[in-house]
């Protein structure tokens, strides 16, 4: 594991490091590695508690594999998995779809009424994110979770060139999960139950909620299993910063071979 000393590092060092990661993983950057690294450094504002890893088997991980799929190949995989979806149209999204059913018995949805949700842009996802969520749903199913309430997947960007493909929420490649509901109706709320602290470690040795309540431990177990399985390239939690106090940001990042957890 490579530990970043913080955003106080010179951006040039971070760029060189990111280039080395992409090279050793054999990943194809979406754009030039230097521009990509600079943008990601600004976007994620990496701090002392964040850690970025570049496993040698990155190409074999779900997130990296999904990030390299074409629209046709991705939709073919959805069909193969018997995932219900319809193709959508969405600016900046490479493979926009809308789910029409649960994933392994888990419903991913916003808080809106069904009539609103049917046309809500926030429920549009890039197909590649859906594949990662389908894997994530297997973890959730093992914890008796049947519903995930999220704030958004896609956020339509403003003043966007029609031929430009977005990342994160602009590209519908990230989900902000706020609440997890089990089959008994119990709600695990990230805001109230995660019990983290800004700058604290999220997963791995020495990482633990404080206090370590049963609900906090369940949330941590769910999240860290997803981290261990490399389902998402970027995982941000309440340990990251105040704007993430109430949700997990789960993101597939196309064209990279690294993983950022905070």
Question: Whereabouts are the PLM-identified features?
Answer:
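Active-site acidic/histidine clusters and adjacent loop/turn architecture
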Residues: 60-150
């Amino acid at each position: 594991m490579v530990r970043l000393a913080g955003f106080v590092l010179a951006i040039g060092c971070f760029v060189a490091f990111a280039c080395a990661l992409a090279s050793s993983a054999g990943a194809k950057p979406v754009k030039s590695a230097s521009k990509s690294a600079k943008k990601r450094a600004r976007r994620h504002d990496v701090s002392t508690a964040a850690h970025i890893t570049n496993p040698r088997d990155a190409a074999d991980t779900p997130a990296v594999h999904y990030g390299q799929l074409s629209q046709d190949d991705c939709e073919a995989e959805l069909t193969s998995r018997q995932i219900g979806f319809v193709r959508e149209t969405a600016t900046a999204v490479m493979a926009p779809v809308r789910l029409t059913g649960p994933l392994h018995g888990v419903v991913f949805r916003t808080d809106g009424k069904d009539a609103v949700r049917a046309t809500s842009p926030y429920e549009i996802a890039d197909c590649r994110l859906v594949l990662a969520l389908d894997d994530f749903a297997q973890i959730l199913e093992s914890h008796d979770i049947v519903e995930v309430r999220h704030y958004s997947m896609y956020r339509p960007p403003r003043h966007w060139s029609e031929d430009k493909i977005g990342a994160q929420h602009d590209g519908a490649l990230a989900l902000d999960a706020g609440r997890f509901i089990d089959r008994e109706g119990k709600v695990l709320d990230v805001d109230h139950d995660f019990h983290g602290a800004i700058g604290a470690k999220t997963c791995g040795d020495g990482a633990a909620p404080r206090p370590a309540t049963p609900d906090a431990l369940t949330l941590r177990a769910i999240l860290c299993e997803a981290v261990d399985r490399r389902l998402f390239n970027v995982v941000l939690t309440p340990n990251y910063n105040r704007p993430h106090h109430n949700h997990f940001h789960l993101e597939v990042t196309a064209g990279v071979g690294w993983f950022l957890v905070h």
